[in-house]
Amino acid sequence: MNIRHTVFTLLAAGSVAVSAADKMRVGYLAEPAHGLHFIARDKGYFAEEGIDAAMFQFATTAEGCSAVRARKLDVGTFGTAAPLLFIARGADFTIFGGMMIGGQAIIVKPENAAKFRDLTHFKGKKVGLGKLSTGDVIFRGALKKAGIDPYKDLRIIEFGGQNAVVEAVRKGAVDAGIVFSPHFSLARKKYGLVVSNYIADFQPGYTCCRLIANTPDVKAKRDVYRRYLIAEIRAYKFYREHPEETVRIFARALKLDEDLIKADTYTNRTFESNPDPLKKGTLDFWNTMKAIDYLPKTEVDINRHIDTTIYREALDEVLKRYPDDPIFKEMDAFFKANN
C-alpha cells in the first residue's frame, strides 16, 4: 500500500504543502476506446486527483488479466469475457468501473461480406479472434440463438493479437475474424477487408472493457481508486465536449492517423468510451457466458466481484463540485439506469 506523505515545494510566492501522488500501474489495449486513460493523463486530471498513472500496453485480454492477477498492475482494462472467466477460475478481481461499450466487428474479404451477414453461413467455417475476446462470447451467443452449435458447427481459432487475426483473414487462413477498433478500420485501409457484422448488431450496448483490480488492493486503497475514477469521469466529459482535441490525444497515444481515429470514435461511433461499471450489463454478460458453456462449473457469486459504490462516490464528488453540469447529470441518470 502506498503511504501518502507531505513534501514541500518552494515556489516564487513561498512554500506550499503538496501531497505526493499515489502511483498506479494501468494496463490497457491499443484501441481508441481506452482513450479516457490518455485524456486523464494528458489533461492533468490524474495529477490533479493525486494519481501518478503509469500506462502499460498489452496485446491480449488474457495477458492483461494475468498481469493484474500477478499484482503487476493496479488497474486493468481488458474486456468483459476475460475478467469474468478469470473470476470463475478463482481470481479475486473486483470490477469497479468501465471503459468501453461495444467496439468489435467481424471482418471478411469483400466478396464474402453479404453471405456472412446471415449467421447460418458460418457453419463449417473458420473464425479467428484474439484470446479471450469479448466479441467471442457475444458471437457464440448469437450463433446459439440462430440454432448453430458454436463449438461443433464451426471452428474458432485464437490468435496472439489483433494484427495476427487480420493477417489470417487477408491470407485466407480463416474465413472471418473478430477484431476491435481500430483494427477493422486499419484492415479496410491497408488490405481492403470489410466489416460484415458489428458485434453490437447481435447485442446492442453490450459491455466491453471493464476496470478491474485485485480485491485486496481495492479494499486497502479505496480512496485511491475513488480518485482514479474521478479523473476518468472528468476525462469522459472532455471526450464528449472536445472531439477534435480528443482525436489528437488518441492518435498521439496510439500512433495512428487522426482521420481513422475520428471515424471510429465520432463519425461512425463504433464504440462508446464510458467509465460506468454497468453492473446490469456485466451480469447479462455473465449469464450469456454460462448459457454458451464458456465458463467452468463454478459456485462463484459474481455479484461479490462487482463494486459500484466506489464509482458512485466518485460521481457524487464530481456532482458536488459541478452541480449544474449537464454531462455529469446525464452520467448520474445513466448510472441509476444501469446499476
Stretches found by the model and what they are:
Residues T9-A20:
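Hydrophobic h-region of N-terminal signal peptides that target proteins for export
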Residues D22-G160, V165, D175-S181, S196-I199, ...:
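Short, glycine-/small- and polar/acidic-enriched structural segments
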Residues A220-V300:
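Secondary-structure end/capping motifs
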Residues A291-N339:
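Conserved C-terminal helix/tail region of periplasmic/extracytoplasmic solute-binding proteins
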